[in-house]
Amino acid sequence: MTPSLQDAKITFLGGGNMAAAIIGGLLAKNINKQNIYVSEPWEVNRNKMADLGVRTTTDNKEAAADADVVILAVKPQVAKGVCEELSSAWSSRSSLPVVISIAAGITLASIAQWFKGDSGKAPPIVRVMPNTPALVGEGASGLYAAQDVTDAEKELTSALLGSVSKATEWVDK
């Protein structure tokens, strides 16, 4: 069952500017800080996230182990490795989290293939294109979902992105 935004365990893989903006929006909506986990390799960014009161680590597998939502907020050149790393870590999970990619220029098909790995199973994936006004809570986001994303997962994604966007729009291509 898909949890509500208030109850969801949300993991950010990457702690850059857009992740920080979304986290700020979530905290402004009184989301429990302990439900937000950020995996970030750079100490400076990790410390900024810790200053917000959320949990931090350098270990993607640890951060995403029991997540309901994983936000792929990494640089495009490292996305494949991150997805493949999690694919092996999630092989024993009975249900997979919804993955929301804000990584620029990476297709759903690529993300799905990277997650499938040896298991042949990809999580439900949503691709989001937030714009820079999201950095100050005034954004607009275009969202595109893979076919296996449920209505409840779409609602959760809309609520999450609504924390930094004045408008969210689902598109079909």
What residue spans do the PLM features occupy?
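NAD(P)+-binding Rossmann beta1-loop-alpha1 motif at the extreme N-terminus of oxidoreductases
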Residues: 1-66, 138
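Predominant activation on well-ordered alpha-helical scaffold segments within soluble catalytic domains
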Residues: 23-24, 80, 112, 158
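Short alpha-helical
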Residues: 17, 43-44, 77-78, 106, ...
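Short loop/edge segments at beta-strand edges and connector loops
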Residues: 40, 58, 126-130, 171-172
